[in-house]
């Protein structure tokens, strides 16, 4: 049985939104990993003596910097990453809600067309 044009269109939109949700999930994982790395770096810095020589990576080189300067820089980076994480989470919630709504709409459209969704028709 051929799917009605409107159902085909809704399914295509649903698949696009699924891809978007997957991309958002990858972004979220990346940001979470960066947050963890930054937190670990801050923990290590907090254990170092105040006059310890510390270095930061800049491309392929290491540059010696003051501990407090690097700590401040990493704190700012952490705050930025945490804001980004919250933004991504809100985006993810919106997309997941939209996916659920679309799934219901597609199922109703298929029932209206005499197709039993999920039964392999």
From Swiss-Prot:
The keyword Cytoplasm applies. The keyword Ligase does not apply. One of its GO terms (biological process) is protein folding. One of its GO terms (cellular component) is prefoldin complex. SUPFAM superfamilies: Prefoldin. InterPro entries: PFD_beta-like, PfdB, Prefoldin. Heterohexamer of two alpha and four beta subunits. This is Prefoldin subunit beta. It comes from Methanothermobacter thermautotrophicus (strain ATCC 29096 / DSM 1053 / JCM 10044 / NBRC 100330 / Delta H) (Methanobacterium thermoautotrophicum).
